[in-house]
């Protein structure tokens, strides 16, 4: 059995952001020092629904990689429908290199309509079929970027 910590950086008490980040670092260090297997960071935008305050799990992962020795670093999740697939694939691969191979990739389609409409109108959750097609295409491109030396893609 493996144990991971879902580090949902909620800010119910409206602390200064630097305080929230420092608390997140303390949790991360605690998990690393006490042999937890992994730590997972979220991606949410606009700090409204649920008060989640982490907008970029890869940046949080880079911070964790620089401060820890063994814990695996995951994203719960990268909302891939919000991002350019090649850029996101590159960023994940770079984090994996910076962390000496400790990355766990977590992906999703998004959950809050307001986030989707503001991050990428093509990811609108009101049209689930379109959102899913975008998700599939984005993931296909990301996999090609990770596994093929050269590739092309013809899509929507």
Positions of predicted regions on the chain:
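N-terminal beta1-alpha1-beta2 module of alpha/beta enzyme domains
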Residues: 1-67, 71-72
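Flexible, glycine-rich active-site loops centered on histidine and acidic residues
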Residues: 2-19, 81-154
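Short, flexible coil/linker segments at or flanking structured domains
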Residues: 24-27, 61, 76, 91-93, ...
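Structural motif
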Residues: 42, 76, 106-108
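Generic secondary-structure boundary/loop-capping signal
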Residues: 43, 68-70, 77, 148-150, ...
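A short, hydrophobic/aromatic-rich structural module that often spans a beta strand
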Residues: 51, 56-59, 88-93, 156
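Conserved strand-turn element in the central/C-terminal portion of the radical SAM core barrel
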Residues: 74-82
């Amino acid at each position: 059995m493996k144990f991971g910590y879902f580090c949902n950086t909620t800010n119910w008490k409206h602390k200064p952001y630097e305080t929230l980040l420092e608390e997140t670092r303390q949790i991360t260090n605690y998990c690393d020092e006490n042999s937890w297997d992994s730590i997972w960071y979220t991606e949410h935008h606009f700090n409204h629904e649920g008060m989640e305050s982490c907008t970029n799990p890869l940046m949080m992962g880079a911070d964790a990689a620089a401060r820890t020795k063994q814990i695996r670093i995951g994203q719960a999740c990268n909302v891939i429908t919000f991002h350019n697939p090649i850029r996101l694939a590159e960023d994940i691969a770079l984090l994996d290199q910076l962390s000496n191979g400790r990355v766990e990739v977590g992906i999703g389609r998004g959950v809050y309509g307001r986030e989707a409409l503001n991050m990428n109108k093509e990811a609108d959750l009101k049209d689930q079929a379109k959102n899913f097609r975008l998700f599939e295409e984005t993931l296909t491109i990301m996999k090609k970027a990770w596994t093929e030396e050269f590739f092309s893609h013809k899509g929507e």
